[in-house]
Design a protein with these regions (language model features):
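Cysteine protease-like catalytic core of ubiquitin/ubiquitin-like
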Residues: 158, 162-262
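Residues that form generic nucleotide/phosphate-binding pockets
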Residues: 112-116, 215-220, 279
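Generic alpha-helical secondary structure signal
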Residues: 107-110, 211-214, 270-274
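Cysteine protease catalytic domains with a Cys-His-Asp triad
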Residues: 1-185, 191-199
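Contiguous terminal or domain-adjacent regions
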Residues: 250-283
Length: 283
């Protein structure tokens, strides 16, 4: 790497296909500029329809809408499901057509981030959690006081390192589990150097780390004395809808090797997040 470090990942650096297809060559101005499905799928579908160039139109889909293409393709449902999981980004919710900045739910976030876990063996996405993740589980039988999200409460960085993991991501909502949700934030743990891990907290509004997450971060210092903790103080978000997108973008930048210090030096806009929705979710 040269002396100038990247501060952000550009939209053009993020594949519109499943991220494990990052090596796929895209030729602008051709059908392949929006193609994620393999040629063999197009050949199979085109046997009973018009030529490739008119395939989307003949099936009643807009050009490049490969989820729509599979909906109407003469293929077995199990094959369609497999193709979606292997090649395509998660499907863009229909409600976004009328409300393009609709709040992300936990499933939207989980579906996107789990694809990165599939694409990058050294990365694990631990999950999407409420702020009371460490509270006793109210649904536990016999009144046992067990952590609501045990996988997070029991997270051991050294164990993860020995499993081959070098980055761990997670997203939190600042509401407890019994409420409807208020604001998404993210945590990323860099364990490339297990002797000096870096745990960084990101809030798109730049607010202080909530006490429960701060306590979790301090717990990693108890595991590894030289663990470094950090948070962003810069405000990125100025609207009220894109906190989930900002949280995912932060983790994606960390996965791409952007340093936390560089990432926090300047912000990206809410409009950038709206454009990113069109990349991370497809039709």
């Amino acid at each position: 790497m040269g002396s100038t470090q990247k501060r952000k990942v550009a939209l053009t650096d993020i594949s519109r296909c499943h991220p494990k297809m990052k090596g796929k060559k895209i030729v602008k101005g051709t059908r392949k500029s929006h193609q994620c499905l393999p040629d063999s799928v197009y050949h199979e579908i085109s046997k009973s329809h018009l030529s490739k160039n008119g395939l989307f139109q003949s099936l009643g889909c807009n050009e490049g809408e490969e989820h729509c293409l599979l909906d109407k393709a003469p293929l077995d449902d199990s094959i369609k499901k497999s193709l979606r999981r292997q090649y395509l980004r998660p499907r863009r919710p229909k409600g976004w057509d009328a409300d393009p900045d609709m709040w992300l739910d936990n499933y939207n976030i989980m579906h996107v981030m789990k694809q990165y876990e599939e694409a990058i063996p050294s990365f694990t996405f631990l999950g999407v959690f409420p702020i009371d993740f460490s509270a006793p589980n109210p649904y536990q039988p016999d009144g046992e006081k067990k952590c609501l999200h045990k996988e997070l409460c029991d997270l051991n960085l050294i164990n993860e390192y020995h499993k081959g993991k070098r980055g761990i991501g997670m997203v939190f909502n600042l509401d407890p589990h019994y409420k409807g949700g208020s604001h998404w934030v993210a945590l990323y743990i860099n364990i490339v150097n297990i002797n000096k891990p870096f745990v960084c907290y990101f809030d798109s509004y730049g607010y202080d780390t909530p006490p429960l997450i701060a306590r979790l971060m301090r717990s990693f210092k108890l595991q590894i004395k030289n663990c470094h903790l950090g948070r962003n103080a810069r405000r990125f978000q100025y609207g009220n809808s894109e906190c989930g997108m900002f949280s995912m973008y932060f983790i994606i930048c960390m996965i791409h090797g952007i340093s936390f210090k560089q990432f926090c030096k300047d912000s990206v806009s809410d409009d950038f997040m709206l454009q990113l929705r069109k990349v991370l979710f497809s039709k």
